UniProtKB/Swiss-Prot annotation:
GO BP annotations listed: L-histidine biosynthetic process
Recorded metabolic or biological pathway in which this protein acts: Amino-acid biosynthesis; L-histidine biosynthesis; L-histidine from 5-phospho-alpha-D-ribose 1-diphosphate: step 6/9
Keywords: Amino-acid biosynthesis, Cytoplasm, Histidine biosynthesis, Lyase
Species of provenance: Janthinobacterium sp. (strain Marseille) (Minibacterium massiliensis)
Source domain of life: Bacteria
Keyword Amino-acid biosynthesis: yes
Protein name in the entry: Imidazoleglycerol-phosphate dehydratase
Family classification: Belongs to the imidazoleglycerol-phosphate dehydratase family.
A GO CC term assigned to this protein in UniProt: cytoplasm
Annotated SUPFAM superfamilies: Ribosomal protein S5 domain 2-like
GO molecular function: imidazoleglycerol-phosphate dehydratase activity
């Protein structure tokens, strides 16, 4: 591989200070410190199952709640991914994954289309996972989608345990990312679109 697909993005606002460094062609190494333990756990799933190296440091207004931190980590990760993947030449573009965890099953499908769109259908069985508000899962993915410029479909097909539901979503997301971002040796240097650009 001639050019490393890496990026580092810093985002500072009155609400959060975030730094994200990624290597799309990594091995799943991670260093995560967002101040939101459950978010760190979910980001670890993305790294491990996507084989993406992630280094994320975040400080936010957690004295209010975790909303700004979770959303802004999604935004910054999306920006980093867009920068690292570059012009998208040679990538597979589309990725999908089904992931089970005991009784839970989720499907994630992604398209590096250049157009942001999120379909999020996760009927969580409770509103909190420990101290984590499950509504923030949607905010994370909306932030990612808007800044990575991808079309993302997330469906939890079944599940009784909210932790399992959420974990299958993040694992499937990591695996779908890996598939879509993978370089196809049969289309080196080619944009995977009849338009010639994405």
């Amino acid at each position: 591989m001639s050019t490393p697909r890496t990026a580092e993005i810093t985002r500072n606002t009155n609400e959060t200070q975030i730094r994200v460094a990624i290597n799309i062609d990594g091995t799943g190494q991670q260093k995560l410190n967002t101040g939101v333990p459950f978010l760190d756990h979910m980001l670890d799933q993305i790294a491990r199952h996507g084989l993406i190296d992630l280094d994320i440091e975040a400080k936010g207004d957690l004295h209010i709640d975790a909303h700004h931190t979770v959303e802004d980590v999604g935004i910054t990760l999306g920006q980093a991914f867009a920068k690292a993947i570059g012009d998208k030449k040679g990538i597979r573009r589309y990725g999908h994954s089904y992931v089970p965890l005991d009784e839970a099953l989720s499907r994630v499908v992604i398209d590096f289309s250049g157009r942001p769109g999120l379909e999020f259908h996760v009927p969580f069985t409770r509103s909190m996972i420990g101290t984590f508000d499950v509504d923030l899962t949607h905010e994370f993915f909306q932030g990612f989608v808007n800044h990575a410029l991808v079309s993302l479909h997330i469906d939890n097909l079944r599940g009784a345990n909210a932790h399992h539901q959420c974990e299958t979503v993040f694992k499937a997301f990591g695996r779908a990312l890996r598939m879509a971002a993978e370089l196809d040796p049969r289309s080196v240097g080619t944009i995977p679109s009849t338009k010639g650009s994405l």
